[in-house]
Amino acid sequence: LTKTTGVFDATTVAAVRSFRDKWGFYGEPIVTAGVFKRLDVLTHNHGHLPKACLTPKKVICVDMTQRVLRLVQLRKTVLTTDARFGTSQNPTVKGVFKVYRKDVRHVSSAYKTPMPYSMFFNGGSAVHFSPYFLADGYYGASHGCVNIRDLAVAKRLFRVTSIGTPVVIYAS
């Protein structure tokens, strides 16, 4: 989180747009009771981690409700980034998995799309950078993978993640 500056500048405008895109707040310039209730539901358990994430080991924790991926080490969040998931036709499966394969330049054989910095955790499902998520934001979806839109974060996560690292996917 950043400090409040009292200035509504280009950085603030970009942050508000990003928030609106992530949560679908359009045409709602006034915080009504309904908007406030939605905000409360979305942020009520912000940062709450399930027991499977609170181990002495390094864990990739993916909260599908908050739409974030957190890297947790020694029971503390050391990295947080936006994430997006599959659709009802191609869902991202909830559960506890382990990274079993890493591929820096993977291309999907099923969809012929790039999946750079892939960390596979369940069959063909992986945590990976998505140039489409970067370009389209939350308007698109994956085919069951966990997409990361920040390339630098994906590279860092790939570098510090080992085979066998737990991946916990849940809804808070």
Regions found by a protein language model. Give the residues of each.
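Exported/periplasmic cell-wall-interacting domains
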Residues: 26-27, 45-55, 90-94, 103-172
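Short acidic, glycine/serine/threonine-rich helix-capping segments at coil-helix boundaries
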Residues: 1-39
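A structural motif detector for short, solvent-exposed N-terminal "entry" segments of globular domains
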Residues: 48-87
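Extracytoplasmic/secreted envelope proteins and their assembly/folding machinery
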Residues: 13, 17, 36, 66, ...
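Conserved hydrophobic/aromatic pocket- or pore-lining residues that grip, position, or stack substrates
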Residues: 69, 99, 119
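Well-ordered beta-strand positions in beta-sheet-rich domains
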Residues: 80-82, 96-98, 166
